[in-house]
């Protein structure tokens, strides 16, 4: 039994040496010819042949999906146009009374058409920043407006941050009303706006004309609720407007 085992070890050793010699001869031949066997790689660290491992495909990097809402997408493709509206009216309230109503941005949510929310954010160096929310189904948007004033003469509001408008500017001007009637004033209202998307423009065209046309009336009604209604002679008011 012992002799058999020794012969077995000797035979295995001889077989191993023969395989290694064959491998070396093959490698020397490959070096001379400059060819590489297909599907075979040489592991120099241990001197054995091994099948080439196929490269695993790299996992694809996560695709970056750019999210854009339909309204934002419509803007650069379709665009919109700037719209302007102005109105002048003689009112039965003094300059100071109407100025106080227009400058009271905090309470716009109470009486301004389609204004759902109004909140003053800051007031520095004569400039007030306010956040307004306007809603006309199905659109409800918030924007920040900067309001600057010339006391008893002008209130100017400009949209400075929002998704709804490319441009929104509102100007109110106050001047004397009927001659000899300090309890009257002339209110000039001007608004210009441009929506960021054509879709908003289409929605606005259905009703926004009525909104801006109701604006002066809304402020006049608010003044009536606070100060009491004051009538202005229509003929005198018409004559004053004609002179302007």
UniProtKB/Swiss-Prot annotation:
GO terms for cellular component: mitochondrial inner membrane; mitochondrion
Biological processes annotated in GO: cellular respiration
Major location (coarse): mitochondrion
Membrane topology: Peripheral membrane protein
Family: Belongs to the COQ10 family.
Assembly and oligomerization: Interacts with coenzyme Q.
Source species: Xenopus laevis (African clawed frog)
Function field: Required for the function of coenzyme Q in the respiratory chain. May serve as a chaperone or may be involved in the transport of Q6 from its site of synthesis to the catalytic sites of the respiratory complexes.
Keywords noted in UniProt: Membrane, Mitochondrion, Mitochondrion inner membrane, Transit peptide
Subcellular location, record wording: Mitochondrion inner membrane
Gene name as annotated: coq10b
PANTHER family: COENZYME Q-BINDING PROTEIN COQ10 HOMOLOG, MITOCHONDRIAL (PTHR12901:SF14), SPERM PROTEIN HOMOLOG (PTHR12901)
Protein name, per record: Coenzyme Q-binding protein COQ10 homolog B, mitochondrial
Domain of life: Eukaryota
Gene Ontology MF annotations: ubiquinone binding
């Amino acid at each position: 039994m012992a002799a058999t085992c020794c012969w077995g070890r000797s035979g295995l050793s001889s077989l191993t040496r023969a395989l290694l010699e064959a491998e070396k001869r093959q490698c020397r031949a490959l070096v001379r010819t400059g060819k590489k066997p297909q599907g075979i790689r040489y592991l120099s660290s241990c001197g054995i042949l091994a099948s080439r491992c196929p490269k695993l495909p790299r996992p694809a990097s996560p695709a970056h999906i750019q999210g854009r809402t339909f309204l934002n997408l419509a803007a650069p493709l379709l665009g919109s146009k700037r719209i302007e509206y102005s109105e002048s009216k003689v009112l039965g309230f003094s300059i100071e009374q109407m100025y106080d109503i227009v400058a009271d941005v905090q309470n716009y949510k109470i009486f301004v058409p389609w204004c759902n929310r109004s909140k003053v954010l800051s007031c520095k160096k004569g400039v007030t920043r306010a956040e307004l929310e306007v809603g006309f189904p199905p659109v409800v948007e918030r924007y920040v407006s900067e309001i600057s004033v010339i006391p008893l003469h002008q209130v100017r509001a400009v949209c400075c941050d929002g998704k709804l408008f490319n441009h929104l500017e509102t100007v109110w001007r106050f001047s004397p009303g009927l001659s000899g009637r300090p309890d009257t004033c002339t209110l000039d209202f001007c608004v210009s706006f441009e929506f960021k998307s054509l879709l908003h423009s289409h929605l606005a065209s259905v009703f926004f004309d009525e909104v801006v046309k109701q604006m002066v009336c809304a402020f006049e009604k608010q003044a009536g609720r606070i100060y009491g209604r004051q009538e202005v002679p229509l003929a005198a008011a018409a004559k004053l407007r004609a002179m302007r």
